[in-house]
Regions:
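Terminal, low-structured helical/coil segments at or just beyond the last alpha-helical repeat
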Residues: 130-166
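Helix-turn-helix repeat elements of alpha-solenoid scaffolds
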Residues: 31-46, 78-86, 119-120
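TPR/TPR-like (Sel1-like) alpha-helical repeat modules
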Residues: 80, 84-87, 118-136, 165-166
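Short coil/turn linking the two alpha-helices of tandem helical-hairpin repeats
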Residues: 34, 67-76, 112-117, 154
Length: 166
């Protein structure tokens, strides 16, 4: 009887943690919606509750941490949010080097950090890997998000933008 009860509790806890876990699309949509400090903080708190078992979860955890820098008034906190967030994204990329979504996340963060901070050293590599592989990306929504970002940024040359637009 006690064994059955323990199994039911373990099953309930597993289901509860599954329901709290955010899927890739939900994380993507929530990240795209991080337009205020409150939304960003809410996303950060929610993603902290999950145990990042997948590289994409680790990547989004790092991206939202880095994004918190945008809303912090403290320069040291801004720097540390970016540094720690980029470190998390880079660790995820080490194990999933061709995941375009992870490359996109790092590219978004690094391309928006002032160059004098020295944290934008992966921009060229990430851009190149994305440009080389975006044509074969099966996720249409992700492809559209990445293409739109690149077309509206100053990261790509006119030639690269023409290739993306076609």
């Amino acid at each position: 009887n006690a064994g059955k009860r323990r199994n039911r509790i373990a099953t309930f806890q597993s289901l509860q943690s599954l329901s709290q876990a955010m899927g890739r699309i939900e994380m993507r949509n929530t990240f795209q919606a991080c337009s205020t400090a409150a939304i960003t903080e809410s996303f950060h708190n929610r993603i902290l509750k999950s145990n990042p078992s997948k590289d994409i979860e680790q990547g989004y955890r790092g991206a939202v941490l880095a994004l918190k820098a945008k809303y912090s008034a403290n320069p040291l906190k801004k720097y540390n949010y970016c540094k720690d967030g980029l470190s998390m994204i880079s660790k995820a990329i080490e194990t999933s080097p061709y995941d375009l979504e992870l490359r996109y996340l790092r590219l978004v963060i690094e391309s928006n950090i002032p160059a004098f901070l020295g944290m934008n050293y992966n921009v060229k590599d990430d851009k190149q890997i994305i440009l080389n592989n975006i044509g074969s990306e099966q996720d249409v929504n992700l492809k559209q998000i990445i293409s739109s970002f690149l077309l509206n940024s100053n990261i790509c040359t006119d030639k690269e933008k023409k290739m993306l637009a076609s």
